[in-house]
Amino acid sequence: MALITLRQLLDHAAERLQGYGVPAFNINNMEQGLAILAAARACDAPVIASRGARSYAGDIMLRHIVEALAEMYPQIPICLHQDHGNNEATCLSAIRHGFTSVMMDGSLQADMKTVASYDYNVDITRRVTDAAHWVGASVEGELGVLGSLEKGEAEAEDGSGAEGKLDHSQMLTDPDQAVEFVQATRVDALAIAMGTSHGAYKFSRKPDGEILAMRVIEEIHARLPATHLVMHGSSSVAARLQDLINAHGADMPQTYGVPVEEIERGIRHGVRKVNIDTDCRMALTGQFRKVAMESPKEFDARKFMIPAMKEMEALVRDRFERFGTAGNASKITVIPMDDMAKRYASGALDPAVATAKAA
């Protein structure tokens, strides 16, 4: 099956009777890709394969990995997505190398450390959207700065993360401004800032509404019911994986992630894409450490990789099933990017805004 755009995939997710979410898993190497696609085939789920660490595996390598996966698993629609693009050149380079979707993160300036103004965000995101839509590619934007409401700080990940102290006005997406932003930029999906952050150390306690503001998602969905919302930094950081890692030589402090139940709540209110990376890293690392400690004479990297891939496959399948993604791959007929470009040009995919009902 051909690669699919993010817009078509998330439209399909929103059009189902109950709606479903699609986890976006970072792919940095072959083993992660094989684990994700094995899980997808087992439960008939479409896939968003996201490139996060650009310096680790560049556009060309990842494109060929995903092309190979698409050939091996022709029954699975795969969206090849670039995460946290820092400027137009990064986004357009990804599209030129075969990515069907890009994220323009204009919440930060090009250094990915300095908080950007709203006008800067609108301007650069709109420019990327205009260019991407000409060729049928999808664009995700971000409004508000990802980070911990507890600490007032962002967690740097793969070179991306605001520096310095932040206040809640910066770290919570304003629902009214979200409407303006979507109308001005015509993004296909909108990443929301509501207390999640990158990395493992998201919360010092089980999150509640004070530090994980799910109400923001609900308020934005009420105003933008047709806009696909995105939760970043949504690994659950399961205690089981923390314990597995620490039982085999690590010293990982206790931490809390985003409960899967809260993600399911978000899906009921318009969240269609859910970014998950730390959970996959932990699944892999736990098994690496287990093999290293239990078989100290082992030197064959494959003996480390195989159980690690199985652990990650189980985690990925669980998310496909919990988010309602399972069972939908075979229901999707991919629309070519040229046809998506025509739909953008016609205005058929312009954003819709909820109108207030008369009293």
Curated annotation (Swiss-Prot):
Protein origin, superkingdom: Bacteria
Record-listed E.C. numbers: 4.1.2.13
Binding residues for D-glyceraldehyde 3-phosphate: S50
Residue positions binding dihydroxyacetone phosphate: G199, G233, S234, S235, N275, I276, D277, T278
GO MF assignments: fructose-bisphosphate aldolase activity; zinc ion binding
CDD domains per UniProt: TBP_aldolase_IIB
Catalytic reaction list: beta-D-fructose 1,6-bisphosphate = D-glyceraldehyde 3-phosphate + dihydroxyacetone phosphate
PANTHER family: D-TAGATOSE-1,6-BISPHOSPHATE ALDOLASE (PTHR30304), D-TAGATOSE-1,6-BISPHOSPHATE ALDOLASE SUBUNIT GATY-RELATED (PTHR30304:SF0)
UniProt function note: Catalyzes the aldol condensation of dihydroxyacetone phosphate (DHAP or glycerone-phosphate) with glyceraldehyde 3-phosphate (G3P) to form fructose 1,6-bisphosphate (FBP) in gluconeogenesis and the reverse reaction in glycolysis.
Protein name (record): Fructose-bisphosphate aldolase 1
Species per Swiss-Prot/TrEMBL record: Cereibacter sphaeroides
